[in-house]
């Protein structure tokens, strides 16, 4: 039995590391997974190489949940740069879980699929909090606000917006984040989260960005460059190194910010917030560029 799953990357409104409460939005960058149930072993393979423990554990936990005694072959491909703050791990786990459920011809509630992926991330040590907020955005689409400690979805909204992404060439793995320094800024991150709960996502993003840039040692220059152009919804994404900005769907705001950010080393591109749930997608077979 073989099937496919697709899940989205995401951008940060509030990083959950400081206070265990977070907010994120899905973006139009996808990870595809193909799962074939066969044999006794669970084996994962990532296009371009990489650590396959997360997708293997996500598949294993899903099969346990479904009561299916089988091995599996998992293959993933992705448009999301790894260790960039754009939620590549959440997308990989979600896509794998969706594909596994489909291969087993069974269905699981989307939030339960998210919780399986979060547990897999904690089990293999790729996340500090399990990234329930990022995983919810990746799976459900739109903007989400969550309590990561309780694995509770507090709020989900549709948001129509273009997104400008600046992805520097370097990488920053979430599991290597300086948690102690992040917890020092907790009172102010709590304030930013309250602002986000009131629906002022752009203001919350900017505050989150300045706070985490300071705590984690990233430059705030890209945020200031966006503010100079009147783009107020801008932040460091996750634990970096990427930055994301919400911009108008109309006019030249996206082009102006893309030009400004292109002065920095790395890649700049424009995408959009995705409001459709990944669990609704048909999924695509992984076609590797080999």
Curated annotation (Swiss-Prot):
Any idea of its EC number? Answer: 2.7.1.71
Molecular function GO terms recorded: ATP binding; shikimate kinase activity
- Reaction(s) catalysed (UniProt annotation): shikimate + ATP = 3-phosphoshikimate + ADP + H(+)
Q: List the disulfide bonds.
A: none
Broadest EC class? transferase
Q: Which Gene3D superfamilies match?
A: 3.30.230.10, GHMP kinase, C-terminal domain
**Main localization (coarse):** cytoplasm
Q: Which domain of life is it from?
A: Archaea
One GO cellular component term noted in the UniProt record for this chain: cytoplasm
The UniProt keyword set, sorted, is:
Amino-acid biosynthesis, Aromatic amino acid biosynthesis, ATP-binding, Cytoplasm, Kinase, Nucleotide-binding, Transferase
Q: Which GO terms describe its biological process?
A: amino acid biosynthetic process; aromatic amino acid family biosynthetic process; chorismate biosynthetic process
Which residues bind ATP per the record?
Answer: 81-91
Signal sequence, start to end: none
Question: Where is the protein localized?
Answer: Cytoplasm
List the pathway annotation: Metabolic intermediate biosynthesis; chorismate biosynthesis; chorismate from D-erythrose 4-phosphate and phosphoenolpyruvate: step 5/7
The record's similarity note reads: Belongs to the GHMP kinase family. Archaeal shikimate kinase subfamily.
Q: What is this protein called?
A: Shikimate kinase
Lineage start: Archaea, Methanobacteriati, Methanobacteriota, Stenosarchaea group, Methanomicrobia
């Amino acid at each position: 039995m073989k099937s496919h799953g697709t899940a989205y990357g995401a951008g940060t409104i509030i990083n959950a590391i400081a206070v265990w409460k977070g907010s994120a939005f899905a973006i139009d960058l996808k990870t595809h997974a193909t799962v074939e149930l066969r044999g006794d072993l669970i084996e994962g393979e990532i296009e371009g190489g990489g650590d396959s423990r997360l997708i293997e554990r996500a598949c294993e936990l899903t099969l346990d949940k479904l009561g299916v005694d089988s091995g599996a072959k998992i293959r993933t491909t992705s448009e999301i740069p790894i260790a960039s703050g754009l939620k590549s791990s959440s997308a990989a786990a979600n896509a794998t879980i969706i594909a596994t459920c489909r291969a087993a011809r069974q269905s699981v509630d989307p939030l339960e699929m998210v919780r399986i992926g979060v547990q897999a991330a904690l089990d293999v040590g790729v996340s500090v909090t399990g990234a329930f907020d990022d995983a919810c955005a990746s799976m459900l689409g739109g903007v989400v606000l969550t309590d990561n400690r309780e694995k509770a979805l507090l709020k989900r909204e549709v948001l129509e917006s273009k997104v400008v992404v600046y992805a520097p060439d370097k990488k920053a793995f979430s599991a290597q984040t300086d948690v102690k320094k992040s917890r020092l800024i907790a009172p102010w991150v709590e304030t930013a989260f309250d602002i986000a709960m009131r629906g002022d996502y752009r203001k919350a993003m900017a505050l989150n960005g300045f706070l985490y840039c300071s705590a984690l040692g990233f430059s705030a220059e890209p945020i200031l460059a966006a503010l100079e152009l009147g783009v107020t919804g801008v932040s460091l994404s996750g634990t970096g190194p990427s930055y994301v900005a919400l911009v108008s769907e109309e006019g030249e705001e996206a082009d102006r910010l893309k030009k400004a950010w292109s002065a920095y080393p790395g890649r700049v591109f424009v995408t959009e917030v995705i409001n459709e749930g990944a669990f609704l997608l048909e999924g695509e077979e992984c076609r590797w560029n080999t």
